Regions:
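N-terminal cap/lid segment of alpha/beta-hydrolase-fold proteins
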Residues: 29-73
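Short beta-strand element of the alpha/beta-hydrolase
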Residues: 65, 75-85
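Cap/lid segment of the alpha/beta-hydrolase catalytic domain
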Residues: 82-143, 149-151, 200-207
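Primarily recognizes the serine-hydrolase "nucleophile elbow" in alpha/beta-hydrolase
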Residues: 146-205
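Active-site nucleophile elbow and catalytic-triad environment of alpha/beta-hydrolase enzymes
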Residues: 218-233
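Conserved alpha/beta-hydrolase "acid-adjacent" motif
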Residues: 251-257
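C-terminal catalytic histidine-bearing segment of alpha/beta-hydrolase fold enzymes
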Residues: 259-322
Length: 322
């Protein structure tokens, strides 16, 4: 399982505007460059169309994605969905939320489901400690999401004032960054993710990791990337509303730590803890859809339709025996 790796350590609170500009420049891109959208195919699911597409990434290469479109002319709300990074899961890709997006479409939602960098062909994960590729992948995930906003808002059937982001685990952190970077979003659902490096760094696990890799090396790396702390962004999400969903049965994201993350997030916000594993559960899905329905002014989705969405499951832990 990959949750956001803590990047900031011993951060200082500097005066506002200059610090904001310095942080935000890391996520700049050319909004006027061509999206170069390529349609690969389309599948009909009842009255919903699922387009298999790709678009140009500002970081180079292509962003594979699904665009889920309801029937009718709109204007529709829009949601970007960010999948988890759970090792061993068949849904470590844009398919995680596909059935949920199709179920929500008739309520009046166009959805964009992205394959984030780890899920793309040719991506080679770098498992070494404190490597630069993890920084590159994180920034690319954020910028590719912002480019996804450009794609959605270029559609004539999308209402620019009703845009939300749903992110799970690693991409909950992506949403945390976006909440303080891109003001085009009205609402965020952040599911079972690390939302503050300063909170994470108080954990025994991270202090043990610091000792293992070497305090001097660790501290130098963290100082270099002090701007990449989710908490410094999600603490400035206002006026967007942030709904945090956490699971009670997790080893690292304990209920106490979850509440500490929630305390960092700006108002307005909601927090709920579920009796679930990292995959969360059907109750969380019902709450998520209810939140999006309220925030984006959607039609109601029948309970039986929500209940028909299959449960996401945690893959089995790797065996330590042969």
């Amino acid at each position: 399982m990959r949750i956001a790796f803590p990047i900031a350590f011993l951060l200082l609170s500097l005066p506002g505007f200059a610090q904001d500009a310095d942080m935000l420049r890391h996520f700049d891109y050319d909004q006027h460059s061509s999206l170069d959208v390529k349609e690969i195919g389309v599948e009909k699911r009842g009255g919903v169309s699922v387009y298999d597409i790709s678009y140009a990434s500002p970081a180079g290469g292509r962003v594979p994605a699904y665009v889920v479109v309801p029937s009718g002319k709109g204007p529709f709300a829009a949601v970007i969905w960010g999948h988890w990074y759970m090792d061993g899961s068949e849904f470590l890709n844009r398919k995680e939320f596909l059935t949920e997006a199709v179920a929500l479409a008739p309520a009046g939602v166009v959805s964009l489901l992205i394959d984030y960098p780890i899920a793309r062909p040719g991506h080679a994960p770098d498992e070494t400690d404190l490597n630069e590729n993890m920084i590159k992948d994180r920034v690319q995930a954020i910028v590719d999401s912002r480019r996804g906003v450009d794609l959605l808002l270029a559609r004539k059937d999308v209402d620019a004032h009703r845009l939300a982001f749903v992110g799970h685990s690693y991409n909950a952190a992506t949403g945390a960054f976006l909440s303080g970077i891109d003001r085009r979003f009205k609402a965020f659902v952040l599911m079972a993710g690390s939302l503050s490096d300063q909170v994470s760094m108080r954990s025994k696990e991270m202090q043990d990791y610091r000792q293992r890799v070497g305090p001097a090396k660790f501290d130098a790396f963290m100082a270099k990337y002090a701007w990449l702390d989710q908490g410094k962004y999600v603490s400035r999400a206002t006026p967007a509303t942030v709904f945090m969903q956490y699971a009670s049965r997790e080893p690292f994201l304990t209920p106490q730590r979850d509440r500490e993350y929630a305390a960092v997030v700006s108002e307005p916000k909601l927090f709920k803890l579920y009796d679930a594993t990292h995959a969360l559960n059907a109750e969380a899905r019902r709450d998520r859809i209810a939140f999006l329905t309220e925030q984006l002014n959607l039609k109601s989705t029948p309970p039986q339709v929500i209940a028909s969405v299959p449960e996401l499951v945690n893959p089995p832990e790797p065996s330590t025996t042969k």
